[in-house]
Amino acid sequence: QQEAQHLLAHRAHVDALIKRYPSLQKTLDNTIQHYENLYEKECLDYHLAYVAGEAAFAPFFGMCIDNREAFFRKGDANVSSLFLWHFCEEIEHRSSGLKIYNHVVGGWWWKIRKLPSMIRHIEECFAAISRDFQKHVPASDWGNDINVFSNPLKDVSIKSRLRCVVGVLAAQMPWHNPAHTSVPGWVGKWSDSYEENQDMARFFGSDEP
């Protein structure tokens, strides 16, 4: 139920963006096609390794949660809450992808060899989306966030960045167990609030228009 609600929230966010900036429909279509092309090009083992590789970035999601004040406090509560919801779910499911890969494929070295191409695919996708947003969203609508793509970590401490990098690198090791990854305490607060039926759609962020 939680994932279904989360999916609908993502879809509503995308629809709202496209309604305001119709040119972003092409961005969505291109992004979907970007993954369709990869799906047709690569084998099942690769796709399972891709999912397992993404799970290794739990330390990055943790960094985003730990620095939620810098990243999300001033943002629209609907959007800030959606992203934090997403990061909490990624951490919650951090073991799933690797477990499936190890059961179906196995082979740590094969997964590591494919990691650069997976990172390149994600970077290409993000770069294309970034270009389109800067092209189709007027500068007047960005406010103080106009440079978000050029320096997204400007308000994150060096210590927090280093902890993230070390965590991501450690997650590539063959003995890594995602279940042992350090989890931000705020994830527990989020889960407890969800169980208490609080409004998670506006759980964090600014109420200012």
Regions found by a protein language model. Give the residues of each.
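Non-heme di-metal
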Residues: 1-209
